[in-house]
From Swiss-Prot:
Coiled coil: none annotated. Pfam families: Ribosomal_L28. Gene3D superfamilies: Ribosomal protein L28/L24 (2.30.170.40). It comes from Rickettsia typhi (strain ATCC VR-144 / Wilmington). Keywords: Ribonucleoprotein, Ribosomal protein. GO terms for biological process: translation. InterPro entries: Ribosomal_bL28, Ribosomal_bL28/bL31-like_sf, Ribosomal_bL28_bact-type, Ribosomal_bL28_sf. This is Large ribosomal subunit protein bL28. The keyword Ribosomal protein applies. One of its GO terms (cellular component) is ribonucleoprotein complex. Belongs to the bacterial ribosomal protein bL28 family. SUPFAM superfamilies: L28p-like.
Length: 97
């Protein structure tokens, strides 16, 4: 499994450790990933996704999982998240008819 958030696309960054004497050594900055269960009110299902800690706060701020994923850009979503988003869109379209 890659070290990448499924909702925001945040992945590993590379940089330097810099000592007091300005000696630089390469290092990795890994995202704070957590495996979290999100409940969709529209599909009435529970989804387990690997997301970073900031994304969890963003989902809560957006008003829930459904609202967040509908506003999210498809370019940063994983294939699993895109499939969930499409399922939510399809159900909302059927309900609006």
């Amino acid at each position: 499994m890659s070290r990448k958030c499924e909702l925001t696309g945040v992945s590993v960054l590379y940089g330097n450790n810099v000592s007091h004497s300005q000696r630089k050594t390469r290092r990795r900055f890994e995202p704070n990933l957590r495996s979290v269960k999100f409940r969709s009110d529209i599909t009435d299902e529970v989804y387990r996704l690997s997301v970073n800690a900031r994304c969890i706060r963003s989902v809560e701020k957006a008003g829930g999982f459904d609202e967040y994923i509908l506003k999210a850009n498809n370019d940063v979503l994983s294939s699993t998240a895109r499939a969930i988003k499409q399922k939510i869109i399809d159900i909302k379209a059927v309900e609006s008819l």
